[in-house]
Amino acid sequence: MNFSLEGRNIVVMGVANKRSIAWGIARSLHEAGARLIFTYAGERLEKSVHELAGTLDRNDSIILPCDVTNDAEIETCFASIKEQVGVIHGIAHCIAFANKEELVGEYLNTNRDGFLLAHNISSYSLTAVVKAARPMMTEGGSIVTLTYLGGELVMPNYNVMGVAKASLDASVKYLAADLGKENIRVNSISAGPIRTLSAKGISDFNSILKDIEERAPLRRTTTPEEVGDTAAFLFSDMSRGITGENLHVDSGFHITAR
């Protein structure tokens, strides 16, 4: 038994730039031999994904549009995937969003539209995507999403995103229960804070990083490569007995007293 992902078709959703956790995951999966299917939303991200995919040493990636707030576009995306590869063996769901003004101050100030937007993109999108992909996961497989400690504990300024991540965490468990009989595993990685494009929207993010460097058992922050290698493990047969799990990759910060 090894970490090889050769012969596996894995969908990677959420790559924005070279600092994205999704890109760290994509590189680890590529190095393990997987064929990658990238999705993007919008022309700006299309260009970025094409440029990054072009840096990989195998030219076998597929790149498709997929707006996860649009069920018809999700269906179109996965119909195209089915036509091109037939079978999907994994999905890396690395998608989250909340309005910047919701990520500062008190959670109580969250408005209805902001609440629904954060949950639609950050939580429900996983269910919508899995629903579309399920008919193509005929050989079993693995689904991995990204969560954060702010879904378990109150983290300053994380606010509505923390509530959305708590919803995502519960979704992982229910999806794992639904899909286990088909040998499809569903897990999440709770990554430590990483300086990504989406992290820029969180107020006082630098203080969060400093706190981790001072208090986490490993005395350092997390890298996209560490998260990527953990994802590769969860996609591999080495993790075949794991489902419904939330695996923390945060230098141990989650065990520290607040």
Swiss-Prot record:
Instruction: Report the protein's function.
Output: Catalyzes the reduction of a carbon-carbon double bond in an enoyl moiety that is covalently linked to an acyl carrier protein (ACP). Involved in the elongation cycle of fatty acid which are used in the lipid metabolism.
The family classification in the record reads: Belongs to the short-chain dehydrogenases/reductases (SDR) family. FabI subfamily.
The reactions it catalyses are: a 2,3-saturated acyl-[ACP] + NAD(+) = a (2E)-enoyl-[ACP] + NADH + H(+); (2E)-butenoyl-[ACP] + NADH + H(+) = butanoyl-[ACP] + NAD(+)
Fetch the Gene3D superfamilies from UniProt: NAD(P)-binding Rossmann-like Domain
State where substrate binds.
A98
EC number(s) per entry: 1.3.1.9
Organism expressing this protein natively: Bacillus subtilis (strain 168)
Mention any Pfam family matching this sequence. Answer: adh_short_C2
Binding positions (NAD(+)): G14, S20, I21, D67, V68, I95, K165, I194, R195, T196, L197, S198
Pathway(s): Lipid metabolism; fatty acid biosynthesis
* Activity regulation note: Inhibited by triclosan and acrylamide.
Transmembrane region(s) = none
| GO BP | cellular response to cold; fatty acid elongation
Single GO MF annotation: enoyl-[acyl-carrier-protein] reductase (NADH) activity
Indicate the annotated site residue(s) for Involved in acyl-ACP binding.
N206
Q: Its domain of life?
A: Bacteria
The alphabetized UniProt keywords are: Fatty acid biosynthesis, Fatty acid metabolism, Lipid biosynthesis, Lipid metabolism, NAD, NADP, Oxidoreductase, Stress response
Q: Does the keyword NADP apply?
A: yes
Q: Where is the active site?
A: Y148, Y158
Q: What induces it, per record? A: By cold shock.
The protein in question is named Enoyl-[acyl-carrier-protein] reductase [NADH] FabI
Subunit structure as annotated in this protein's UniProt entry? Homotetramer.
